[in-house]
Amino acid sequence: MDCALAEKYKNLTHEKEICKKLSLSYYSIQIKYKNLFESENCEKECYRFIEQHFNCGKKMTAISDILGTNEDIKTLSESIRSVHMVSLYLLGYSLYQCFEDDLNKYFMQYIGKSDRGEEYDFRYTWFLTALFHDITSCKEVITKHNEIEGKQSIENVIKSEKNIYDYKLQSGKKFIPKFPKDFVLRYLKEREEKDRVDHGIVAGYNFFNSMCTIFEQKLGEEEIIVEKTDKERMLMWDKTYMDHFVFIADAIISHNIWFDEKTEKMVGKWAYEENPLNFILCLLDTIEPIKRFCEDKRSTLKYNEVLENISVIKDDERKIKISWNDVIRNCELEKWERWKDNIKKLDEWMKIDVEEGSDFLILRW
């Protein structure tokens, strides 16, 4: 088998990183594999890892606005979803060379360079996307216990003044989302009728509202502010970053919308060239294995065992090879088949080619 995810997660480096002897995330946050995936409290360690990124960037309000109570935080920090989000982030980080240049070119069409001429860093976009996309999964099911809160979160979306659908980019161009506003709100209401809060839509709306509010309060009338933090690190607040946030919010909002229950048809095939960040999130969210193999207490495999027995590597330009060994198949046959089938069916709703071998899948787009 090619390099296992466990080995990749332990040895992640980035070409823009000054220190390459440590596995570092954005803000030079250390990626401590054993803590995240082998400790007794993996879920809490992963939640701390998520918090650390938003705290370091002084964006923690985005999480506290949506996880309004200690009970919410407790639920998420004890949930597999926190581990899934971290694994998804590290999976994307390990494959950044597949996407970074394409995303940079795409964003340059709409956002351009900041006044300081800083180069684009995939890790910034990706940590905000991956570590937030399932943040409201702890509130997804509407019950008698949380009915008022669940319906209020939906109402907040509907009444939100700051939203991606009314947003104009700094260039003056109007932002064009993956799905129109009416369709998204209809989809949200249809989910509510089934006692579900679509966690992607609610998270994406809240992300955009919170991030824009944070930056507006910090910047005031200024275009750019460079702030020195407690750890002698420089933190930049740039108005053009709000353009960045609208693309991230759109990816989060749309990442669960692939089937229209009203028409009982797929919503159309997603194209990499048209919405690359949305495409990447849905692609890797489907591939990320922890969510599938460890989703219930009956799972026989631990988090690290899943990552040690699955490989996901860049095989060529716009080509990923996913392979596994017999441990995965023999221990969790039913979950392995479901995970593999979900990946194989990506070509039903994404413009992607899937090739199957005896112990691997190859994806081309």
Language-model segments: residues:
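Divalent metal-dependent catalytic cores for phosphoryl transfer on phosphate-bearing substrates
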Residues: 119-304
